[in-house]
């Protein structure tokens, strides 16, 4: 069944609503809301950075207030090399998430992102990847390695791997071919028909616990087949998200991705998530309404990427309410990204609004 989009009105136009949101932003236990975001790549760090900065502004020091659940299927670049040579899980996405959770002016940001420019076997590797590799070898536990590095650099939240098992992506393509590994999937020109994980992994128990105890769960923007779905395909993750009482938010992508989602609309993204998980997972779908700069859009178009269109009638949204906000930002006229602070404010407001109360306010960011 198709559900029409319901358009809210303006939160800033209703002075009383601001006090209400502030009052309900802390739950019955008097603590800050616990928000869990799932993903990988560049989208998850943007969500975590905004949430952590907003929590710091509110003087919220709860280590469970912001949690990132990161994919472990990357098999390219430095992460892929260390994974193959050392037998560890890929460290790159976890590194980026940890750095998003520390102070913007921390000296560790530049240090852990620094790529070594000489030396046999280490050229091109970020220092943070090597530190995570060393800690993983020392502790014998990749999640413990992430925790220890986070403690060293002053992380303002948690980063958890979705699983500790050595898992690979497998895609059945529309051409009939089957390809294995994230790099091969992105590099093939044929669209993906079906994605799976091999071998079928068990979730990290702490990951499921974080979802169960969350006040808000965010599926962050990013590569549909290589960043969004890998977490949701792990045994028990989608079912847990479907069954919890948390507010569940899907952040729609700004642009399509060459090699994965050419010409996909928002409804196409939602259809793929539903068909792979078997659930309508979301209470809210957060959509950018800010027009994309023409020059930036042309640069993306030259690479085969275009804005993700949000149809007026979404057939695969279930009962989710679509909320439109100004979320996009152009960096140097080249990269189109979600603005971390605007995104965090919208997420916090939706979590505060709850899942059973229909929104009558628009989120002005």
Which positions does each model-derived feature cover?
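Electropositive, gly/pro-rich neighborhoods at or near active sites that engage anionic ligands
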Residues: 2-5, 61-64, 70-191, 344-353, ...
């Amino acid at each position: 069944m198709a559900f029409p989009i319901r358009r809210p009105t303006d939160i800033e136009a209703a002075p009383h609503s601001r006090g209400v949101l502030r009052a309900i932003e802390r739950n019955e236990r008097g603590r800050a809301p616990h928000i869990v975001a799932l993903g990988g790549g560049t989208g998850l760090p943007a969500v975590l950075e905004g949430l952590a900065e907003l929590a710091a502004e509110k003087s919220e020091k709860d280590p469970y207030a912001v949690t990132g659940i990161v994919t472990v299927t990357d098999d390219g670049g430095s992460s892929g090399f260390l994974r193959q040579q050392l037998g560890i899980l890929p460290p790159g996405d976890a590194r980026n998430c940890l750095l998003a959770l520390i102070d913007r002016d921390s000296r560790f940001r530049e240090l852990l992102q620094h790529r070594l420019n000489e030396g046999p076997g280490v050229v091109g590797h970020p220092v943070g990847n090597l530190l995570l590799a060393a800690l993983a070898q020392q502790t014998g536990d990749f999640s413990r390695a992430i925790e220890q590095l986070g403690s060293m650099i002053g992380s303002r939240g948690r980063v958890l791997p979705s699983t500790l098992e050595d898992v690979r992506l497998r895609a059945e393509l529309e051409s009939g071919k089957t390809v294995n590994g994230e790099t091969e999937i992105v590099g093939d020109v044929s669209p993906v028909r079906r994605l799976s994980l091999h071998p079928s992994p068990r979730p990290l128990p702490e990951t499921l616990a974080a979802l169960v105890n969350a006040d808000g769960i965010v599926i962050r923007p990013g590569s549909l087949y290589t960043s969004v779905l890998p977490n949701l395909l792990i045994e028990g993750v989608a079912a847990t998200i479907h069954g919890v009482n948390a507010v569940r938010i899907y952040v729609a992508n700004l642009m399509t991705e060459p090699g994965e989602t050419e010409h996909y609309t928002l409804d196409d993204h939602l259809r793929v998530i539903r068909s792979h998980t078997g659930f309508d997972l979301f209470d809210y779908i957060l959509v950018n309404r800010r027009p994309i700069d023409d020059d930036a859009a042309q640069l993306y178009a030259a690479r085969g990427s275009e804005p993700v269109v949000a149809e007026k009638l979404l057939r695969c949204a279930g009962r989710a309410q679509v909320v439109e906000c100004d979320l996009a930002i152009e960096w140097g006229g080249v990269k189109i990204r979600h603005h971390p602070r605007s995104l965090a404010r919208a997420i916090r407001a939706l979590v505060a609004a709850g899942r059973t109360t229909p929104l009558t306010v628009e989120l002005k960011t």
